[in-house]
Amino acid sequence: ELCEKASKTWSGNCGNTGHCDNQCKSWEGAAHGACHVRNGKHMCFCYFNC
């Protein structure tokens, strides 16, 4: 099971899921990452093992 958390290292709009994924994995130790729209903003979310 994966738990979603907003990225702590990403700033600004998330327009590149691949970049978000790489940053979550390499900088935050996440399983993977992806861009999602929340409250009208494109944000990078990281997914961690719960």
Swiss-Prot record:
Keyword Iron-sulfur among record annotations: no
| Single GO cellular component term | extracellular region
Which cysteines pair up through disulfides? They are C3-C50, C14-C35, C20-C44, C24-C46
UniProt keywords, alphabetically: Antimicrobial, Disulfide bond, Fungicide, Plant defense, Secreted
Biotech applications: DmAMP1 expression in heterologous plants such as rice or papaya may provide a broad-spectrum disease resistance.
Q: Where in the cell is it found?
A: Secreted
Any Pfam family matching the protein: Gamma-thionin
| Biological process annotations from GO | defense response to fungus; killing of cells of another organism
Per the entry, what this protein does is:
Possesses antimicrobial activity sensitive to inorganic cations. Has no inhibitory effect on insect gut alpha-amylase. Induces potential changes in fungal membranes and increased K+ efflux and Ca(2+) uptake. Interacts with sphingolipids and ergosterols found in fungal plasma membranes.
Q: Which family does it belong to?
A: Belongs to the DEFL family.
PANTHER family per the record?
Answer: DEFENSIN-LIKE PROTEIN 1, GAMMA-THIONIN-RELATED
> This chain belongs to which protein, by name?
Defensin-like protein 1
Q: Which organism is it from?
A: Dahlia merckii
